[in-house]
């Protein structure tokens, strides 16, 4: 991904039970994505029509944060068709957790086996982790898709999503 990226994960983990740095191995019970379930099951059981994989990337020395090594000002919008069902997969190639948030639509998190697990607005992706979720593009317009660590968002870890 070029100069905007200072590391890349070859074998990302797919586990959802990692509480994150500083909380592992302390003997505490920590709520993780693996513990969460949405009552009633998957609100939209359709299979995804397409897959989008985005790498969470950055260069800590240069304080650049990006998706696929591309900062917001150099990126193109992601286009979703109205009512399309998609699978978005994040691969975190950085040393930090990133709480990723898509405005206007829900993120239906999948377990490592691909089964629906929980509906969320913000999905935390731990370092060296791969997390997939399904999205139903049911909100027309232009939407923000960004890291909720606002300084990461401001430094480029942001994409525009267009549903049209």
What kind of region is each of these model predictions?
Residues 1-164:
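Copper-binding active sites and cupredoxin-like electron-transfer domains
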